[in-house]
Amino acid sequence: MAGEEHIRQAYASILSGDYEQAIRSFEQAIAAEPGNPAYHHKCSITCMRSALWTKALRHAEEAVRLAPDQTDYRYHLASVQARIAVEEAKNELTAADPDYASVIGRLKLALELDPLLDEAWLLMAAAYGALGRFDEAAQAAREALRLNPAHGEAKRLFADYRRRHRRKQKRTLH
């Protein structure tokens, strides 16, 4: 079966909500035509939506390797790398004794790769807040809110960190 037929099957699986089968179909298309960057790209997108980060990264990198001039492929690769950095930061934050400097570093990397990632801004706010750096925490929460004005957690964090920053300023003035 040619790669295109597997791609059609993958899209049919996506429409029916079976992402695992869609990924298998994309991988069959890739096996039929390993040098087709579009197949790797499509597979990577579906893997990313399923939070299969390693597989998403591998296929995104291969798409860029095969078609380095494709802007969409390079942008998608950066998005996958950003999501992985966010996931690593989240894992670090759940540790018993998080290394906040490391978390902030990972989140800054994620935001360099994808500045529209509101989750990275929220985690950045939480990390700065945990360090008592309330002004920076409020700024990060404000950025998340700017990207997603209806985000309830961003609203709450922004108000909380702004209030804490003001209190801290008053204490240092007196």
Map each language-model feature to its residues:
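Helix-start (N-cap) detector for alpha-helical repeat units in TPR-like alpha-solenoids
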Residues: 2-4, 37-38, 71, 78, ...
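Conserved structural position within tetratricopeptide repeats
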Residues: 27-31, 62-65, 108-112, 143-146
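TPR-repeat structural position
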Residues: 19, 53, 98-100, 134
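Structural motif corresponding to the intra-repeat A-B loop/turn of tetratricopeptide repeats
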Residues: 16, 50, 95-97, 131, ...
